[in-house]
């Protein structure tokens, strides 16, 4: 792959992370260390300072074969038919294997429970996975059993006709009873593991919210996603000054109220069935960890 530098003085690794689609800064550094990146025909160094017009060439190695092992686990299946299964994912469970985390993911559990009854559109690492929720977010996740179901559900996600509603506890109090955050989200310019509200290299992101109950210093809200960007609710709530309680990435660095994870739960999922179009509406009650925080807030108030 060939790229041309455009910003004077930019580091080679930062340039690659910005310009090469799907490449993080750490991944760019690995390519450089493996000798797969050149600058003007010579091996590049990660801290090389580029000049406009510099020719940067890089090679992405063939992906290594990954053997995803089925793992027996207790899956909370709240809806299932021949085309779709909806899982109520507990907090702490990673959805699919990735670098550094190959085992004990939801996909490992799905392979054990459903075997080859999963769509192959997303490849071997993400069989059946139509959309994702964060590791420390609990709640509903639709899984496609075949390629037809996957294609239709993915289309509903794209045209915003699949409805996803989340319950959240956020820091601070809202004056209004409801509102909308319409702010584009993109990769954080200096921390590639984080997202942020940013105008450049971003995508449209819209979150509608309404107050469920106000407590002293905290608010229970309900969020409806119009789009589905990575970390969207967490980023949007932090952006307006109301980070998710327990979110140590976008909010306070130390847990509050004794809970061990962020208070965010995907409680409602609505979609048109991929085969016949009938409406499917699935609910997942608030998990125990969420209810305990609400009880504590009730006593504090």
Where are these regions (language model features)?
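Pseudouridine synthases involved in rRNA/tRNA modification
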Residues: 1-27, 73-75, 199-206, 213-216, ...
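RNA pseudouridine synthases
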Residues: 1-180, 184-189, 283-297
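Short alpha-helix capping/helix-loop boundary micro-motifs
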Residues: 40-45, 217-220, 255
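Short, surface-exposed secondary-structure edge patches
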Residues: 45-49, 222, 261
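Short flexible coil/turn linkers enriched for glycine and charged/polar residues
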Residues: 81, 135-136, 162, 203, ...
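Short beta-strand micro-motifs in enzyme catalytic cores
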Residues: 85, 166, 219-221, 267
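C-terminal regulatory/effector modules of DNA-binding transcriptional regulators
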Residues: 189-192, 239
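Short aromatic-glycine motifs in intrinsically disordered, low-complexity regions
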Residues: 192-200
């Amino acid at each position: 792959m060939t790229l041309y530098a455009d910003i004077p003085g930019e580091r080679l690794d930062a340039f690659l992370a910005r310009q090469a689609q799907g490449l993080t800064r750490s991944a760019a550094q690995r390519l450089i260390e493996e000798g797969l990146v050149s600058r003007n025909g010579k091996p590049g160094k990660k801290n090389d300072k580029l000049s406009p017009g510099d020719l940067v060439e890089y090679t992405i190695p063939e992906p290594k074969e990954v053997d995803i092992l089925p793992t027996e686990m207790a899956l909370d299946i709240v809806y299932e038919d021949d085309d779709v299964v909806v899982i109520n994912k507990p907090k702490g469970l990673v959805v699919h294997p990735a670098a550094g985390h190959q085992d004990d993911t939801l996909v490992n559990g799905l392979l054990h429970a459903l075997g080859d009854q999963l769509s192959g559109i997303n490849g071997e690492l993400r069989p059946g996975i139509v959309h994702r929720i964060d590791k420390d977010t609990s709640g509903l996740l639709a899984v496609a059993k075949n390629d037809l179901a996957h294609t239709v559900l993915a289309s509903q996600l794209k045209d915003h006709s699949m409805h996803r509603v989340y319950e959240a506890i956020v820091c601070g109090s809202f004056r209004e009873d409801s509102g909308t955050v319409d702010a584009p989200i993109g990769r954080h310019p200096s921390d590639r593991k984080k997202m942020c509200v940013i105008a450049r290299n971003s995508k449209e992101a819209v979150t509608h919210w309404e107050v469920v109950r106000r407590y002293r210093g905290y608010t229970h809200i309900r969020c409806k996603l119009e789009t589905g960007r990575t970390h969207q609710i967490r980023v949007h709530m932090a952006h307006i000054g109301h980070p998710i309680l327990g979110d140590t990435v976008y909010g306070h660095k130390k847990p509050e109220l004794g809970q061990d994870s962020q208070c965010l739960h995907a409680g409602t999922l609505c979609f048109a069935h991929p085969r016949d179009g009938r409406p499917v509406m699935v609910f997942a009650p608030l998990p125990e960890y969420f209810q305990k925080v609400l009880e504590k807030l009730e006593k504090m108030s």
